[in-house]
Amino acid sequence: FSRRQSLDSKAVQMNSLVLSMGELLQRSLNESIQFEMRLDEKLWVAEADPNQLESALLNLVINARDAMPEGGKLVVETSNQVLHREFTVAYPNLEPGDYVMLSVTDNGCGMPQSVISRAFDPFFTTKPIGQGTGLGLSMIYGFSKQSRGHVSIDSEVDQGTTVRLY
């Protein structure tokens, strides 16, 4: 499931986009969550739809918040990444090359492999009824594919989760 949306791709200064959302992201969290931004000062320009990127970042931050009901630490990070053929060969349509990475890391409840393997499925959610549609990650997956990028999840139960968007 990755319904194609019309994308308005353009050159995006990722750090500027993240900083412009800082207040909104902070307000999305509760006081028990420490919020940190680690933005690479020499970040390359990304090619993406800025509105879809904002939506993706907000979704990831809300998911991270929900994984830390008792509080914790949430980090939004940007960095330059070179994806080599050894990595991209496992992902059809992902070309080797230079990418800007946006990641959201939390030290919340984490996810077992059985959840990670279904996380991008539409309507799949582990949240209580009425608290999640199960569409956030599937929309991010569709956006990343349509943008010729990639999204990955690294998670450990009781340790936390990092979602990386390239």
Predicted regions and their residues:
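Core catalytic ATP-binding domain of two-component histidine kinases
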Residues: 1-166
